[in-house]
Design a protein with these regions (language model features):
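Catalytic core segments in nucleotide and nucleic-acid processing enzymes
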Residues: 86-90, 100-103
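Residue-identity detector for threonine
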Residues: 28-29, 54-56, 86, 119-122, ...
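Conserved Class I SAM-dependent methyltransferase catalytic core
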Residues: 99-174
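Conserved S-adenosyl-L-methionine
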Residues: 1-71, 76-78, 83-85, 93, ...
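Generic signal for short, ordered secondary-structure residues
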Residues: 91-92, 124
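Conserved adenylate-forming
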Residues: 96
Length: 175
């Protein structure tokens, strides 16, 4: 919730026309996000934070594409990925032609965000730097992102910036 609120502060709350949307798998974080919205005077009808797995059970399918997406997904977590062949037909992942490996979901989160992004929108996703250099399917997904000019820029961040991890991170900005 704090990342959504920070984005609204930068954009100006008056520019958040449709409201705040999100999805969180961790029930504690989900509840904290909702509480944070109330504590910052966001009316209940101005946010829709769903509980569930973003990659295997995405919410907000019926909503229009988003003009701004911010995300700080968990770094290098496991997911069904290439262990579930049906996911290659998912419209979020199919364009790249391959799935992120089941041992590392980083690029699956990036493809998910890209699929929800409006044509003139911008997404900023905090990532583990490994997404820049790992091979195999991840290299093919990166190539897809580059070939289609989706990557606007990459911002390298210092280590010890985020609570709970000492690793350096980066922000991938998609357009």
């Amino acid at each position: 919730g704090s990342l959504l609120l920070k984005a609204a502060k930068i954009l100006g709350r008056e520019n958040v026309r449709q409201g705040f949307y999100g999805q969180e798998i961790n029930i504690t974080t989900y509840n904290l996000c909702r509480i944070n919205m109330f504590l910052h005077d966001i009316d209940y009808d101005k946010f829709d934070i769903a509980h569930g797995d973003t990659l295997t059970a995405p919410m907000h399918w019926d909503d229009e594409p988003f003009e701004v997406i911010v995300s700080n997904p968990p770094y290098s977590i496991k997911w069904e990925g290439d262990g579930n062949a049906t996911l290659i037909n998912d419209p979020r992942f199919a364009p790249a032609g391959v799935l992120a490996p089941k041992s590392k979901a980083d690029l699956a989160f990036i493809m998910h965000a890209l699929s929800w992004l409006a044509t003139d929108g911008t997404a900023a996703i905090v990532c583990f730097p490994g997404v820049m250099y790992r091979g195999g399917a991840e290299k093919k997904i990166r190539q897809y992102l580059i070939d289609n000019n989706f990557i606007d820029c990459i911002i390298q961040l210092p280590d010890n910036l985020f609570f709970g991890t000492s690793i350096a991170t980066c922000i991938i900005v998609l357009k």
